C-alpha cells in the first residue's frame, strides 16, 4: 500500500481530531492529517479532502481511502456524534462544578505553647468549596497583625481545609475572634469568639446539670409521697 504512494522510510505522520463548540451552540468537528510537517488530508462531510500542500500523494491517498467506506463511516460517526456528545457532557459537568458551593465548618483550638505566658490560637476551617476563602483573627472590627495562614489542603471529598494561627500574650486572648469569609456564606460570615465555648460548657456543667438532677430528685420524691398517701 505505502509503496503505491512512493513514501520513503522513515517518515512522520501527524494527526489531530476533535470538535469545537461555537456561539449559538453550533458544534464543528474536524480531522486533519499531516505528513512530514505539511498539511496532507482532512475528513469533511464523510469524504476525504486532499490538502494543496499534500500534492499528488494526498490526492492518491484520498482515492485509496474512499474505497473503504466503512472506515469513513466510523470516522464520521466518531466526529459527528461521539465527540459532540462527550464535549457537551464535559461542559455540563464543568458548569455544575463552577456553581458548586459548600459551606465551611470552623472551630477553635490552642496549639503548642510558643513560650512562657503566651498562647497559640488556632482557627480551623474545613469542608469548603470553592477554594478561595479569607480567614482572619479579629479584635472587634480590626484584623490582628501577626496572623499566620497555612497551606490550603485538599480533603478526600474534594473540599478544602485551612489552618490560621495567632501568637498572643495569654492575657490578651480574651475578646479575640476568628472570622471566616467564603462565597457559600454570602454576607453571613462565621465568627467564633475565643473562650466562649469553654465558658458555655462550664456554665452548663456547673448550673444546668445540677439543676436538672435536683428537679428529677424532687419529682421522684413527690411521686413516691403521692403513691404512699394513695395506698393509705
UniProtKB/Swiss-Prot annotation:
One GO location term (cellular component): external side of plasma membrane
Transmembrane segments: 202-222
One Pfam family from the record: C1-set
Positions on the Cytoplasmic side per record topology: 223-232
GO molecular function: endogenous lipid antigen binding; exogenous lipid antigen binding; lipopeptide binding
Disulfide bond entries: 19-83, 48-62, 123-178
Subcellular localization, as worded in the UniProt entry: Cell membrane; Endosome membrane; Lysosome membrane
Keywords linked to the UniProt accession: Adaptive immunity, Cell membrane, Disulfide bond, Endosome, Glycoprotein, Immunity, Immunoglobulin domain, Lysosome, Membrane, Transmembrane, Transmembrane helix
Extracellular side: 1-201
Occurrences of domain Ig-like (ranges): 84-194
Glycosylated residues in this chain: 45
Membrane disposition: Single-pass type I membrane protein
Main function: Antigen-presenting protein that binds self and non-self lipid and glycolipid antigens and presents them to T-cell receptors on natural killer T-cells.
Subunit structure: Heterodimer with B2M (beta-2-microglobulin). Interacts with saposin C.
Name this protein carries in UniProt: T-cell surface glycoprotein CD1b-3
Species for this entry: Ovis aries
Amino acid at each position: 500500500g505505502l509503496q503505491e504512494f512512493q513514501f520513503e522510510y522513515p517518515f512522520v505522520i501527524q494527526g489531530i481530531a476533535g470538535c469545537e463548540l461555537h456561539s449559538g451552540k453550533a458544534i464543528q468537528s474536524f480531522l486533519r492529517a499531516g505528513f512530514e510537517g505539511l498539511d496532507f488530508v482532512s475528513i469533511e462531510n464523510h469524504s476525504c479532502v486532499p490538502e494543496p500542500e499534500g500534492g499528488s500523494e494526498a490526492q492518491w491517498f484520498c482515492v485509496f481511502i474512499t474505497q473503504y467506506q466503512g472506515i469513513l463511516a466510523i470516522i464520521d460517526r466518531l466526529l459527528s456524534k461521539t465527540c459532540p456528545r462527550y464535549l457537551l457532557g464535559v461542559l455540563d459537568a464543568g458548569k455544575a462544578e463552577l456553581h458548586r458551593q459548600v459551606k465551611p465548618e470552623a472551630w477553635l483550638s490552642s496549639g503548642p505553647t510558643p513560650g512562657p505566658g503566651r498562647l497559640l490560637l488556632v482557627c480551623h476551617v474545613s469542608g469548603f468549596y470553592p477554594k478561595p476563602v479569607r480567614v482572619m483573627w479579629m479584635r472587634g472590627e480590626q484584623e490582628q497583625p501577626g496572623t499566620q495562614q497555612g497551606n490550603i489542603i485538599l480533603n478526600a471529598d474534594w473540599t478544602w481545609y485551612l489552618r490560621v494561627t495567632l501568637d498572643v500574650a495569654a492575657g490578651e486572648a480574651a475578646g479575640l475572634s476568628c472570622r471566616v469569609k467564603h462565597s457559600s456564606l454570602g454576607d453571613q460570615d462565621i465568627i467564633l469568639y475565643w473562650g466562649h465555648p469553654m465558658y458555655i460548657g462550664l456554665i452548663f456543667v456547673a448550673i444546668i446539670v445540677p439543676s436538672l438532677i435536683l428537679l428529677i430528685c424532687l419529682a421522684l420524691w413527690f411521686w413516691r409521697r403521692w403513691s404512699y398517701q394513695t395506698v393509705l
